[in-house]
Amino acid sequence: MKKIMLIASAMSALSLPFSASAIELGDEGGLECGPYAKVGVVGGMITGVESTRLDPADAGGKKQLPLTTSMPFGGTLAAGMTIAPGFRAELGVMYLANVKAEVESGKTGSDADIRSGADSPMPQRYKLTPPQPTIMPISIADRDLGVDIPNVPQGGANHLGDNLGANDIRRADDRITWLKNYAGVDYMVPDPNNPQARIVNPVLLNIPQGPPNANPRQAMQPCSILNHDHWRHLVVGITAMSNANKPSVSPIKVLSEKIVQIYRDVKPFARVAGIEVPSDPLPNSASVEQIQNKMQELNDILDEIRDSFDGCIGGNAFANQIQLNFRIPQAQQQGQGQQQQQAQATAQEAAAAAAVRVLNNNDQIIKLYKDLVKLKRHAGIKKAMEELAAQDGGCNGGGDNKKKRGASEDSDAGGASKGGKGKETKETEFDLSMIVGQVKLYADLFTTESFSIYAGLGAGLAYTSGKIDGVDIKANTGMVASGALGVAINAAEGVYVDIEGSYMHSFSKIEEKYSINPLMASFGVRYNF
């Protein structure tokens, strides 16, 4: 019994220093475990974001305009737990407002003086190139339309074979046009072995034809485009290839980007003529009616610009009226079926794809771009633009008064002011707000009785909403990660003041354009329960 008492006394004596040490740690650095709450304010600056607008002074057409970013600010609210001495886990929410950026527009001045000489052609200030063609997925309605394309009637019979005669090519013109417009495939291509000759596109020769074959098919098979059965197999094969290689971007977004690019290219000329060019893109969920209205709006603005400059330069520049003649596919207009919502989405995509095909290699748009290039390089363009900005008519002294609204305000787009000094205006490129929720882990690096230095890592989700180019965007949710370094000051018993600097990285782009990566400083008060 005495032995047991001695052992218990020894163990009790050994435990006393350990208990005292634990109490001292709690008194020194506030290292006691337990829950806490934190509230604070945050502010900072935006990094890693670039404008989507090209610099008009860049002849290569690749340099973006500089963005002037604002200083976002907001508040934080968090709850956490000190899980071990010097280590804590935290769940926090941060709200950031004023996530805003502006871009310079209408820039004139010394750079405008470079092109102010009337005796020399105006140097290229920006590259004018129509949007590149984009091949869209072929829908079922497009496929059926292609299958039912007949041959053009002929007066006499010609051979059906690999090498079509001139008359046969004329008979297959509608089918060849379908291949080009819907699949982006040229029927005849230059012969690699003889550049002077042309052969049937090898892509068409690789599409299987005929009934099932037990033996492996030949790599290259004859292509008889005038043969109806052969043509049916050709259309089905081309459709399968199109859908297998279809882009991940929706047809509505492709159409919107093309229209925005065209508006951006013609805007300097439109401003000189006093024509207002919209800046709002198509919403991602645009209806068939919205797509049709947008195409009509594009048609009207391009033709108004053309009409404004008709007669400014020689030849037949700006002489031909622009008529895009966009029509909603009839099969999609009906939009009836058991799955109405899915049918509606399919109709929207089909309408957008049809609109993209109208813009692909559009001869009227290409002609307008060429005429604008001539206008831009004309030796007397500066004087002509100044007259357009000052008069209530076209460059010939007449015209509609409506085309001159605001011309005096926008004359900086055509040349420098009389004093040689220009002005810069700023346009808001985006104005957003963010709600960020993160789980963070903190560890103390250095601890004293009065303060501690800590570092932390976090990960979570960011919810972003607001406007881009003045248009409300669809809310974006994406992954974020952050790193922080801070100082915690022991202000009172259980109360700490956290002064922290952090960086947050976004893994996704808003509207596939902007990656918001802010540097932030925060000031918070933490209370340990």
From Swiss-Prot:
It comes from the Bacteria. Residues 106-116 have a biased composition (Basic and acidic residues). It is found in: Cell membrane. May be an adherent factor for rickettsial adsorption to the host-cell surface and a determinant of virulence of individual rickettsial strain. It is the major outer membrane protein. InterPro entries: OMP/PagP_b-brl, TSA. Residues 1-22 form the signal peptide. This is 56 kDa type-specific antigen. The chain crosses the membrane at residues 67-87, 477-492. Residues 106-134, 392-424 are annotated as: Disordered. Keywords: Cell membrane, Membrane, Signal, Transmembrane, Transmembrane helix, Virulence. One of its GO terms (cellular component) is plasma membrane. It is a multi-pass membrane protein. Its main location: membrane.
